[in-house]
């Protein structure tokens, strides 16, 4: 329940733009947020391995 309220709070327009922080829209995780893909690292990895993100391939060397 707390995560839902934090997600709702993150979507509101704040009085000062500095106070805004990024939160994953899929799971609500506030940390390890990738700005380029607008999701957290865990959701990014899950979707990249499933092939849902275009242009992302698994690295091997």
Swiss-Prot record:
Keywords: Metal-binding, Ribonucleoprotein, Ribosomal protein, RNA-binding, rRNA-binding, Zinc. The keyword rRNA processing does not apply. One of its GO terms (molecular function) is rRNA binding. Signal peptide: none annotated. GO terms for cellular component: cytoplasm; small ribosomal subunit. InterPro entries: Ribosomal_uS14, Ribosomal_uS14_bact, Ribosomal_uS14_CS, Ribosomal_uS14_sf. It comes from the Bacteria. The keyword rRNA-binding applies. Binds 1 zinc ion per subunit. GO terms for biological process: translation. Zn(2+) binds at residues 24, 27, 40, 43. PANTHER family: 30S RIBOSOMAL PROTEIN S14, SMALL RIBOSOMAL SUBUNIT PROTEIN US14M. NCBIfam families: PRK08061.1. This is Small ribosomal subunit protein uS14. It comes from Anaeromyxobacter dehalogenans (strain 2CP-C). The lineage of its organism: Bacteria, Pseudomonadati, Myxococcota, Myxococcia, Myxococcales.
